[in-house]
Amino acid sequence: MPKASEIKKNIAISYDNKTYIVKDIERSVPQGRAGGSLYRMRMYDVVTGRKLDETFKDSDMIDLADLVRRQVMFSYSDGDEFVFMDNEDYTPYSLNKSAIEEEILFVNEETVGIQVVLVNEVPVVIELPTNVELEVIETDPSIKGASATSRNKPAKLSTGAVIQVPEHISTGDRIKVNVEERKFAGRAEK
């Protein structure tokens, strides 16, 4: 059983005899309080989708839920439903946009390393690799000699996400994006 301080986003936990997916974690250190940090977790019930905000001490032990991860690839979207195909047995897994709205900003048909998380055979969330490769579809023109400066500019990616990139990046370039930090991580290898 991990401590509250070891829990990460998109982890499935058991709490009050229910299974929740942790979607957001805020760490705070109360002033004048001997002891550790507090972790406020925003969780969603995997069955009902209801939101629960709960605060844990850093030393609180938390039960992890039984879950299965399957390697998948993005197949298609149908309205607010996004369908992912299992890489081994081609089982389709359908997820609602509200369950994966942050992650879907970094997913297209070419994204590799996606995992769907199943709780009781039901898909509840997707997990992305640390870095994904996406194409810049719109940004200000690159400036000659800009690699010497460290200024950034906004760039719209092929998935619709907007991140800050160095000035030497231009429209049409393929770049690596750190999904967790939503930051430019370098040029993609050709």
From Swiss-Prot:
For this protein's source organism, the top of the classification is: Bacteria, Pseudomonadati, Pseudomonadota, Gammaproteobacteria, Oceanospirillales
- One of its Pfam families is Elong-fact-P_C
Source domain of life: Bacteria
Q: List cellular component terms (GO).
A: cytoplasm
Its protein name is Elongation factor P-like protein
| Listed GO MF terms | translation elongation factor activity
Q: Which organism is it from?
A: Marinomonas sp. (strain MWYL1)
InterPro entries cross-referenced by the UniProt entry: Elong-fact-P_C, NA-bd_OB-fold, Rib_uL2_dom2, Transl_elong_fac_P/YeiP, Transl_elong_KOW-like, Transl_elong_p-like_YeiP, Transl_elong_P/YeiP_cen, Transl_elong_P/YeiP_CS
Record-linked HAMAP family: EFP (MF_00646)
The entry sums up its family as follows: Belongs to the elongation factor P family.
Q: Which GO terms describe its biological process?
A: peptide biosynthetic process
